[in-house]
Design a protein with these regions (language model features):
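Receiver (REC) domain active-site loop signature in two-component systems and cognate sites
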Residues: 67
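Non-catalytic signal-transmission and effector/linker regions of two-component phosphorelay proteins
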Residues: 1-15, 30
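Active-site residues of response regulator receiver
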Residues: 20, 64, 94
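Two-component/phosphorelay signaling modules centered on CheY-like receiver
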Residues: 23-41, 55
Length: 119
């Protein structure tokens, strides 16, 4: 007897907001997530992320930290302070890897903190 390992999971009801100022990172994540059937919304800066999160109400936000004008920590604080977006889970994807960065990520509302394996 063999097991069927080609199980397809339908993620099409879930929307993920990808936020990064590096366009190639956004495109890579968008391709990977859409291949898994997620709906993907993108933003290239913190201000757009706040607008997209409020308008689209994603199920998850993948958020870069190092962005110009408004960094990911500031975005997270604003999202968590807004009743419309405060319950959206946030995962930080970043090149930052110090203990203080990780602690700060959790303090400002991040659920997880992952280091980018890509640039």
């Amino acid at each position: 007897m063999t097991a069927d390992v080609n199980v397809v999971i339908d993620h099409s009801e879930y929307t993920i907001l990808v936020v990064d100022d590096v366009v190639s990172n956004v495109l890579l994540l968008k391709v990977l997530l859409t291949n898994e059937k997620f709906k993907v919304v993108t933003a290239n800066n913190g201000k757009d992320a706040l607008v997209q999160a409020a308008e689209k109400q994603p199920d998850l936000i993948l958020l870069d930290v190092m962005m110009p004008e408004m960094n990911g920590f500031e975005v997270s604080e604003k999202l968590k302070a807004n009743p419309v977006t405060q319950n959206i889970p946030i995962i930080f994807l970043t090149a930052l890897n110090t203990t203080s960065d990780i602690v700060k990520g959790f303090k400002v509302g991040g659920e997880r903190f992952y280091f980018k394996a890509f640039q």
